[in-house]
Amino acid sequence: MHTKLLFKENVYLRSCRATIIDIVRDKKGVYFISDQTVFFPTGGGQSCDVGEADGIPVTDVWEEEGVVYHRIDTDTCPFSPGSTVSMQIDWHLRIDNMQGHCGEHVLSGAFYSLYRGHNRGFHMGKDYMTIDIALDEDSGFQKITDDMAREAELRANEVIWADLPVSVHHFNRRSDAEELPLRKALAFDTDISIVTLGDENAPADCVACCGTHPSSSGQIGIIKIYKVEKNKDMFRVYFEAGKRAFRQYQHQFDVITELGNRLSAGTDDLLKKFLVQQKKSDAVRDQLYHLKKEIVARETVEIEKDPNLLRCRRYSELSLDDLNEIGKKLSGKIDVLLFLVHQPTCTVLLFSDTCDCGGLVKGNARLFNGKGGGSKKNARAVFTEAESLQRFIDHVSSQLQADTALGD
């Protein structure tokens, strides 16, 4: 028994009624098998349709040896063999998948026709799609440059603007399918579906595919490449198509508009004003760096002059890295213990040439709801509030004074 795939007859069909053939249960859930289905099962790099069956969510669909399994989100299955069920797919997801998958064909065809680039891998992710393009050794191209990607993107969108017909032909024999100008060699011998964009004699693309596609390229809407990166001996192209690309455009436009408002710039001079602002920020950052270096040097000298064996300094403007730098500069000059407190984060750094700083933190921080660790020469402890941090310092100081009779 094979499940009849209604989407092969009409990809725009959103619902149907079917007869339940069997119910399957395992540790992962409950599944039903029906005589026909409107749901597309996972395959060909495309995720499955989701939707409902008599109001019950259908969360996963796959095909095995011609039989389609529908996973339903329920513990007690209301269906039984012989009963009928009404199926409804999530149409928005179907459209996204149709636009995305057909967009992949269009873009792959563009890379192939322009650069003899072969699609060796395809992934439809939640946030973007990717194709892995391998260039022929005799293509004359060593890599896919930004300019090449822009040219392929333009060619792909020109195919969309031409609103070419998208036809799907089914073949039972490999030899019959191979009469078409295929972009890619066939991987199987029977039950072959070939998707062709445009004229079969000179198509924009022609390749085997089991996915769902719109009836014309114009329904894809738009294709946008985001980036190209090296991936082993290929080039991975990140892109989007259709509504997903449009939503990304909207988001990017909103970001650019907000940046323009903040910089009092239009789109024409936004980059120029940003670079000016960046130059100013770099100058301020450089000044801050040198000022902090000077403060760290002065603090190091002041602490070194402090005659107390237990020393504690508090800071709100310097960073933890700055405090760590002070402690390192004083290495070899700390007879007992130095506390450096970073007030914004309720963190204390411990430095010593003679005490086990890590041991002091490990043995005492938890007594005051703190946590931390470190080595013998330096450690840090973090607390939820300033009061707990101060109690920790007082406790450790008293402990050391008792151990070394510093109070005498």
Language model regions located:
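A generic structural motif
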Residues: V30-F32, E65-D75, M129-A134, T347-L349, ...
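Active/ligand-binding-proximal structured segments within catalytic/core domains
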Residues: T37-A53, F79-D132, K376-K377
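Functional cores that coordinate and move charged inorganic groups
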Residues: L93, S113-N231
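Short amphipathic
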Residues: S15-D22, V168-H170, P307-E317
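Hydrophobic helix-and-loop "lid/oligomerization" segment in the mid-to-C-terminal part
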Residues: T257-P344, L350, T354
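Conserved nucleotide-binding/hydrolysis modules and their immediate coupling elements
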Residues: M1-S83
